[in-house]
Amino acid sequence: MNTEQQPTMMEIIPTDGIIATSPNAIPMDDIEDAVVLDDIDPDNHPNFIESNTSAITLEELTEKCIVPTFADNALTISHGGFIKSVIEAGRTVFGELTPVEIRVSHQINGRVPSALHKKQSELSDAEKTTYFQRLAWVCHVAGLTRYINGQPVNLCIGGVRAYNEDKLFGRESPMKFKIFVGWQVRVCSNLCLTCDGFTGNFDALTVSDIKERALQLFSGFDPHKDENLRTLEALGNTRITEEQFCGIIGRLRLYKALPTATRNELGLPNIILGDQAVNAAVRGYVENPNFKKEDNLDSITLFQLLQLFNEAVKQTYIDKWLERNQNCTDFAFGIQQAIDGSNPAYSWFLT
């Protein structure tokens, strides 16, 4: 009998949101060393989020946008202050970072008091004010690239902030932020977010609070970053047929129509993917240039399934993007475990 100890590896348990060990994951000895590829051209690669967002530089965000206040005129933490505090933490843990990519939405325009009685056409640039209600940003750890199922991926950090989640009409109070760290597929800029790389919503009153929370997240993730990647890569070892894919899509549509009580009775996991994302994943199954089903095969891998859904949720509003991205990862892991027979909660999507 073979008594050789099997290599262990962390495994994401989507229903619990915890990390465990698994003997089936890819051994750590198989991890390739970091390689340096050409720098990513920010003007010639897919955006990490689409929806109704637009690009802006950190300089424009800092110099051309006002900072909203609370009702008592106390300043909120600026978007620029948020980004810079997380970057400081990122450099402390990971070293050199690439320039930040920023996407914003929901522009709020105004004017200075001296121009209150002017027509819009008469306003000068100096009399106009603006800020963006929602912000998402990302930057990469410089020179750190790995390969997952033949695709180069970059370790990245970033965050999301939405003023609409703060109580600006009251007195100064804690503000909400989200920070993440994870692997981003280079060819499509899809983020593969797992529960151990995402803070969720947290409250902060100062940039020091933000930096402290970022340091906690990054310091906890850094020692296991390659294990995290190999857990994702293991999705490429499991395939689903076209019939199974269609069954999953049908179940996802049915899931949205089920009453909450029925979902609870069936023991179903929490799925927050909307019909628009499901439809986009179906189109991607046929059309996506990187992850569609190949003509000579009758199946796709669960890594392809994950990327189809990750691509789909890039059309989500900024303030919901990270939660839905992580939900995609949980769903792919759940289907993998259902096929293995280790997670009955997701078996419903395969029946």
Where are these regions (language model features)?
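Feature for intrinsically disordered/low-complexity regulatory segments and propeptides
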Residues: 1-87, 94-106
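Compositionally biased, flexible interaction segments
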Residues: 59-176
